[in-house]
Regions:
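Catalytic-core regions of core metabolic enzymes
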Residues: 1-509
Length: 509
């Protein structure tokens, strides 16, 4: 593999286009070898999602982490994967949801894959995401903090008592924070460094990283850097705390120094960015909770698009809250509005992109406004949909459930409305889902603060939204529905209502 990063490589198996054996077969074979501590997967596609789930569950039970680098995620990459292997790589969102469901850590580059496997091989996964960074440079401390901001890792501050213990090992010229710049006053003094490192590591954090870049040539006298690594190892042994050495760049820890770090029971991680990815991946594995097996899916031969009004009637019958509405010709619009009650929303049917065509008017408060809207709206033979307008609105949310063969039923949640594509704030799950799954996914959205009372606004009824998603998903899985998109679901202070719906079903005609 040509890697020179200190990874203990036991086996390498290639399955080509998986015409005979698949990646799941290779994983199953490796799990029979009790010497295997972690398994990396470089794959373009999963041949059988249910078989993959089976071996992933087995790996989790045996405590053998899986790390996946899946290619073909872009449009160009998928085209290459298709021509190269004969199997479509599939949508990235579906694969990410599959890996997340079974606790498979994901990475994006070969370097991240190697660093993650190296960390998992030497000490296993992490129980949490709280980390400490130590360095003798404020610039390195800032660099680590900036790069970690793109991850789910947390630099939790030291408590008052913990800070006092650390300060007792330092001069008054050094201030204590996390990330921690310990300066160089103690440089080369193994005992002094060990006391400070031990005080830092004697706390509740999950792992401590020491940023250390050593001179590459013997004539540059790297002895004092070995002292720093030994001091970290001494502190780790004394406290029982997990610690790693991190180089700013991969070139900053040479082979002899890597070997020494490994001999002392530590992991040398090469490159700050790759190291943080590895730490995050180890926490993903360590915090995984077993989930029920996801529902299998088959691709339909033919599909048909159901009109919005019919789609809403079907959704209403499934228990999804939709506005009270009537489908009527132009001449009956006023009477239909009187039946559902003002304010009303008027939609011209038979058009694919209603908003762009000026075929949607929301919040019409009386007959005068309704008639004015009707006169400016395009008319079609399909007529008009007159609905009650939802006035209790805290947030607009996108909810989609679709078959994503060969993986499973993909549930997507995101920032909804006409700006969905612009914000691209979406997270994904595989069905079946629970209310807790849905609420956890919503918390991962960048727009999550809008659901919790942003700038004095009321909080959204997340319980009602989660109930809607669970009810919809349970009804769709295993049915003739191929895809249902609710955009938006209007979530109020009380309740959640789907005001627009797209429904695609199997067509057996």
């Amino acid at each position: 593999t040509f890697q020179q990063r200190g990874l203990r490589l036991g086996s390498m198996i290639t399955v080509g286009n998986q015409a005979c054996l698949g990646s799941d077969d290779a994983v199953a074979a490796l799990l029979d070898d009790d010497r295997v501590t972690a398994i990396g997967l470089f794959l373009e596609a999963v041949r059988d999602a249910q078989q993959f789930a089976e071996v992933a569950e087995r790996a989790a039970e045996q405590g053998v982490p899986l790390v996946a680098l899946q290619t073909g995620r872009s449009a160009a990459g998928a085209l290459i994967a298709n021509s190269h292997t004969g199997s479509m790589a599939g949508r990235a969102a579906a694969y990410d949801a599959l890996f997340a469901r079974y606790g498979v850590a994901t990475v994006r580059t070969p370097a991240e894959l190697v660093e993650t496997l190296k960390l998992l091989d030497n000490g296993g996964s992490l129980r949490g995401r709280s980390i400490v960074s130590m360095s003798c440079s404020g610039g390195e401390a800032s660099l680590v903090a900036d790069r970690a901001d793109d991850t789910t890792l947390r630099f939790e501050p030291f408590s008052t008592e913990h800070t006092a213990r650390i300060e007792s090992t330092l001069t008054e010229l050094v201030s204590v924070s996390n990330p921690f710049d310990y300066h160089t006053f103690m440089w080369g003094d193994r005992a002094a460094m060990g006391r400070t490192f031990g005080a830092v590591m004697d706390g509740p954090h999950d792992v401590t990283m020491l940023v250390l870049d050593a001179p590459p040539r013997p004539e540059n006298d790297p002895a004092s850097w070995y002292v720093a690594a030994d001091a970290l190892a001494d502190a780790a042994e004394a406290t029982g705390h997990r610690a790693v050495v991190v180089a700013t760049l991969a070139e900053c820890i040479n082979e002899p120094f890597r070997a020494h770090i490994i001999e002392r029971g530590l992991t040398p991680l090469l490159g700050i960015a790759d190291a943080l990815v590895a730490l995050e991946a180890a926490a993903t594995v360590g915090q995984h909770e077993p989930a029920p097996r996801h529902a299998p899916v088959t691709a339909p031969a033919h599909t048909a698009l159901i009109d919005e009004a019919s789609a809403k009637r079907r959704l209403g019958a499934l228990g999804v809250s939709v506005p009270d509405g009537r489908v009527v010709p132009a001449g009956d619009v006023v009477s239909a509005a009187a039946e559902v009650g003002y304010p009303v929303t008027l939609k011209a049917l038979g058009l694919t992109h209603k908003s762009e065509a000026g075929a949607v008017k929301v919040g019409l408060r009386d007959e005068v406004a309704l008639v004015a809207a009707l006169t400016t709206m395009p008319h079609t033979d399909a007529g008009f949909l007159v609905e009650s307008t939802v006035t209790d609105v805290v947030a607009e949310v996108l909810v989609t459930v679709r078959r994503d063969a060969p993986i499973g039923w993909l549930v997507s949640l995101g920032f909804g409305g006409v700006m969905t594509e612009v914000w691209s704030d979406i997270t994904h799950l595989l069905a079946p889902v629970t209310a807790d799954d849905v609420k956890g996914a919503l918390q991962r959205l960048r727009s999550a603060p809008l659901l919790h009372g942003f700038r004095g606004r009321p909080a959204a009824d997340i319980e009602a939204l989660a109930e809607l998603v669970v009810r919809l998903t349970d009804a769709v899985v295993g049915s003739d529905i191929v895809e249902v998109e609710l955009n938006p679901v209007l979530v109020g202070a009380s309740g959640a209502t789907a005001v627009d719906a797209l429904l695609i079903v199997e067509d057996h005609s």
